[in-house]
């Protein structure tokens, strides 16, 4: 069986946001992703970062195809809801991370199609909600969900 590559790109996203002079914040290690930021996230992950990995794999002699979780409805996402527990006041507070998501369902059909053609899938962890919204998904979370769906 061929490998399936799921990649992140936090430093590359940060670099592009800086170049575009878009401020970014993190809460508990998660990037708050507003409307301007999600466009940059998708551009960097699905574009530059994904294609540089595809190029590296091709240069090693293997065939690969770069996709995102939106392609083939691979990752249907939902908004990630985080709750901050303030231990001093014992009060829970909802944290709005914007367009940060988590996988709701995985349809690995597109992955199986690529593997059947002897191509390594290279996946950017960007998903789409049932509402049509694009969501930024943590790469480790996406990789775990994809692995479970493939029974790997």
Spans of features found by a protein language model:
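Nucleotide/pyrophosphate-binding catalytic subdomain
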Residues: 1-152
């Amino acid at each position: 069986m061929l490998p399936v590559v799921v990649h992140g790109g936090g430093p590359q996203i940060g670099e592009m946001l800086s170049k575009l002079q878009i401020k970014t914040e993190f809460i508990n290690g998660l990037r708050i992703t507003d409307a301007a930021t999600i466009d940059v996230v998708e551009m960097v992950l699905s574009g530059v970062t994904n294609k540089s990995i595809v190029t590296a794999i091709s240069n090693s002699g293997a065939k690969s195809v770069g996709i995102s979780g939106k392609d083939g409805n691979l990752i249907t996402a939902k908004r990630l809801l985080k709750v901050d527990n303030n231990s001093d006041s014992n009060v829970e507070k909802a944290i709005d991370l914007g367009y940060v998501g988590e996988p709701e369902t995985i349809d690995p059909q597109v992955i199986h199609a690529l593997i059947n053609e002897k191509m390594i899938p290279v996946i950017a962890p960007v998903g789409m909600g049932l509402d049509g919204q694009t969501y930024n998904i943590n790469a480790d979370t996406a990789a775990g969900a994809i692995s479970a769906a493939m029974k790997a």
